[in-house]
Design a protein with these regions (language model features):
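A short LG(V/I)-centered, amphipathic sequence patch enriched
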Residues: 4-25
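Alpha-helical linker/hinge and terminal dimerization helices associated
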Residues: 8-9, 30-52
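Central regulatory/effector-binding core of bacterial HTH transcription factors
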Residues: 56-118, 189
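Secondary-structure junction motif
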Residues: 113, 155-179, 244-247, 259-263
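A ligand-binding cleft/hinge motif common to bilobed small-molecule-binding domains
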Residues: 113-119, 170, 178, 191-221
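Ligand-binding "clamshell"
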Residues: 117-130, 144-145, 214-225
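Flexible hinge/capping segments at coil-to-helix
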Residues: 123-131, 135-157, 245-246
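C-terminal effector-binding regulatory domain of bacterial HTH transcription factors
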Residues: 194-195, 209-221, 226-264
């Protein structure tokens, strides 16, 4: 091997005789520079392996504002802590825009409330949550551990603007479709009021998933609706996935299992 290397370099690296082998000037230079070069090569291989495993790069996530209380922060935190080579950024987006943004590459992944339509993407169930209502602690129905849908329908019901999330709006309004008398729905003037001041009248109810408890202002509470179906949260990825996308999927799947987001 040494003679082949000398032939390729066109110079002797060793002086050989019957008693000893001594490095030439070229051989000494090679011996001095080889360890750093090999270490750099090892680092290059490690970097390539990390990239192939989806552990390097910039990750852009768009999420529905309503999953910003718990689900999106938990996934982003796990991605950051478990992958030091990833630069992760997450921003709220209008829910109907998330799947198209993933499909055309403006963002790498999305987290949506409800299974949103869209071409060129794959949707993975990330979380199931009970549907209930937010209400003032002094509301007459707050004394019940669970609320009947028919009982809730007797009060004014606040729903988000349908344009913000048609899938969820239609799912929530459908809960009360068969209620008599017909429920009184209204859309708030302020689309996202963190104080939830309209619920403090002790009359109005706001259908919401149980994750709403995580960002609930003082004076309000949440109660499940008996017999209501689950509200779902989905991870949205491109149909054609890179190692980075497969990494996101694996981390999300592990997190959902650990936090019991998907009951057996």
């Amino acid at each position: 091997r040494m003679r082949r290397l000398e032939a390729e370099l066109g110079t002797a690296l060793l002086v050989r005789n019957t008693r000893s082998v001594v490095l030439t000037t070229a051989g000494a230079a090679l011996a001095e520079s080889a360890p750093p070069a090999l270490a750099a090569l090892d680092r290059a291989w490690d970097t390539a392996r990390s990239a192939a495993a989806g552990e390097l790069g910039t990750l852009r996530i768009g999420y529905s504002l309503s999953v910003g209380a718990e689900t999106a922060p938990a996934l982003v935190d796990r991605l950051i802590r478990g992958n030091s080579g990833l630069e992760v950024g997450a921003v709220p987006m209008a829910t109907p825009e998330i799947s198209p943004a993933v499909a055309d590459g403006r963002i790498d992944a999305g987290i949506t409330r409800g299974e949103q339509p869209g071409r060129g993407v794959r949707r993975f169930l990330l979380r199931r949550a009970r549907i209930g209502v937010q209400l003032a602690q002094h509301h007459p129905l707050a004394e019940h551990p669970e609320i009947e849908i028919a009982d809730a329908a007797a009060y004014p019901l606040r729903l988000p603007d349908r344009e913000a999330n048609p899938v969820i709006h239609d799912q929530l309004s459908a809960l009360f479709r068969d209620s008599r008398p017909h429920p009184r729905f209204h859309t708030p003037a302020v689309s996202f009021d963190m104080s939830q001041r309209d619920l403090r009248d002790g009359v109005t109810l706001a259908p919401a998933g149980e994750a709403a408890v995580m960002a609930q202002p003082a004076g309000l509470t949440w109660r499940p609706l008996r017999g209501a179906p689950s509200l779902t949260i989905h991870l949205v990825l491109p149909r054609e996935q890179s190692p980075l996308h497969r990494r996101i999927r694996a981390v999300a799947k592990t997190l959902a299992h650990e936090l019991h987001w998907l009951p057996d």
